[in-house]
From Swiss-Prot:
Entry keywords, A to Z: Cytoplasm, DNA damage, DNA repair, Hydrolase
Entry EC number(s): 3.2.2.27
Family: Belongs to the uracil-DNA glycosylase (UDG) superfamily. UNG family.
Originating species: Halalkalibacterium halodurans (strain ATCC BAA-125 / DSM 18197 / FERM 7344 / JCM 9153 / C-125) (Bacillus halodurans)
Gene name of the record: ung
Taxonomic path: Bacteria, Bacillati, Bacillota, Bacilli, Bacillales
Catalysis: reaction(s): Hydrolyzes single-stranded DNA or mismatched double-stranded DNA and polynucleotides, releasing free uracil
Function recorded in the entry: Excises uracil residues from the DNA which can arise as a result of misincorporation of dUMP residues by DNA polymerase or due to deamination of cytosine.
Compartment(s) of residence: Cytoplasm
Name of this protein: Uracil-DNA glycosylase
Length: 224
């Protein structure tokens, strides 16, 4: 049975047979059966499900999923409807308001971005409840590095958005100069004032897309 159901399957199915992934899968089986793990196992690959490879225009790279109840659903920075906005997402929405005048919505459900070609990818796709970074170094990084490499190999330009040191370490994988890389400090309250605020990523992305003759992203998240 195919895990992925769009063009990502063509380039990533081989990963699922590799020794590192077989080991990761066994680890996850054990974790999901003995611990509370986020997101739901049915949501792990949502970033890839919502944003096919051929349709990805922008990549916003996150670290690992939110580790509180009902938050994570497989898209970086996004939370399920009805869940309070985490501080980093509050700051993303503040910058969006300053940049493009978009009102801050009553939810942090970023699916509308993903459906327009914004790949909301975490570098680690699972986490234990209440334990940030608990699934780092278990194999996910090899898998998501392959995702980034597939995008790097693509003819059509991609805009990579790398917020914070962790995301910027992945710059080494982006070797093709047809792509665009936007960097800024992480939107976390600990670093947002060091240059995330005022970086205007959303208007910059839309300007690049316009120059390429691509449709721009409608960034405003509707209230629910």
């Amino acid at each position: 049975m195919s895990i992925l159901h769009n063009d990502w399957a063509d380039v990533l199915e081989a990963e699922f047979q590799k020794p590192y992934y077989v080991q990761l899968r066994e680890f996850l089986k054990q974790e999901y059966s003995t611990q509370t793990i986020y997101p739901s196992m049915y949501d792990i690959f949502n970033a890839l499900h919502y944003t096919p490879l051929a349709e990805a225009k922008v990549v916003i790279l996150g670290q690992d999923p939110y580790h509180g109840p009902n938050q994570a659903h497989g898209l970086s920075f996004s939370v399920k409807p009805g869940v309070p906005l985490p501080p980093s997402l509050q700051n993303i929405f503040k910058e969006l308001r300053e940049d493009l005048g978009c009102p801050i919505p009553n939810n942090g459900h970023l699916t509308p971005w993903a459906e327009q070609g914004v790949l909301l990818l975490n570098t680690v796709l699972t986490v234990r409840k209440g334990q940030a970074a608990s699934h780092r170094g278990k194999g996910w990084e090899s898998f998501t590095d392959r995702v980034i490499t597939c995008l790097n190999e693509r003819e059509k330009p991609v805009i990579f958005v790398l917020w914070g040191r962790h995301a910027q370490e992945k710059q080494a994988l982006i070797t093709n100069d047809r792509h665009y890389i936007l960097t800024a400090p992480h939107p976390s309250p600990f670093s947002a004032n060091r240059g995330f605020f005022g970086s205007r990523p959303f208007s910059t992305i839309n300007r690049i897309l316009q120059e390429q003759g691509e449709s721009q992203i409608h960034w405003e998240i509707p209230n629910l």
